[in-house]
């Protein structure tokens, strides 16, 4: 799988994005190289797409596939796209506070530590549905890793569309989120404009 090895804070600077959206509380004191430079319309559209891909850790081909699915659904394409990205299993694990970052959540899912409705799921891109119950498997719960994770994600707010029981390392999807409650700094309309060309 393709991996972008650019340092995280450097990418955040270039995308003019706060690293807190990735679960990282570091701040860069440097300015982006091109700060203040006028960006073209295409440049702005491309930046929004790169931002969404970077936040959710999705590569170009899967991202394009999400867009095509979003286009076929009823409603607004941009909103459908953001909702689909938000419903990825790795993102839900991150939102529940069972992983410090989405990257760590992907690793936890890959290593078969996660159960969805009692069944092991090791696909980070698995899309959860309303009513799904997500938990860390029993064998893994006693691991020191999860104690550390819960300590560092203790102050993180769980979105209203999810319910988390940190002590049991268990959560559930109460409802499908609306765009208004998805807290990511992405203008999805620019992504739609980019793909509509």
UniProtKB/Swiss-Prot annotation:
Keyword rRNA-binding: yes
Pfam family, one: S4
CDD domains associated with the record: S4 (cd00165)
PANTHER family in UniProt: 30S 40S RIBOSOMAL PROTEIN, SMALL RIBOSOMAL SUBUNIT PROTEIN US4M
GO biological process, one term: translation
Free-text function comment from the UniProt entry: One of the primary rRNA binding proteins, it binds directly to 16S rRNA where it nucleates assembly of the body of the 30S subunit.
UniProt name for this protein: Small ribosomal subunit protein uS4
Gene3D superfamilies to which the protein is assigned, alphabetical: Ribosomal Protein S4 Delta 41, Chain A, domain 1, RNA-binding S4 domain
One Gene Ontology term, aspect cellular component: small ribosomal subunit
GO molecular function: rRNA binding; structural constituent of ribosome
All residue ranges annotated as the S4 RNA-binding domain in the record: 87-147
Family, as annotated: Belongs to the universal ribosomal protein uS4 family.
UniProt entry tagged with the keyword Transmembrane helix: no
HAMAP family: Ribosomal_uS4_B (MF_01306_B)
InterPro entries named in the record: Ribosomal_uS4, Ribosomal_uS4_bac-type, Ribosomal_uS4_CS, Ribosomal_uS4_N, S4_RNA-bd, S4_RNA-bd_sf
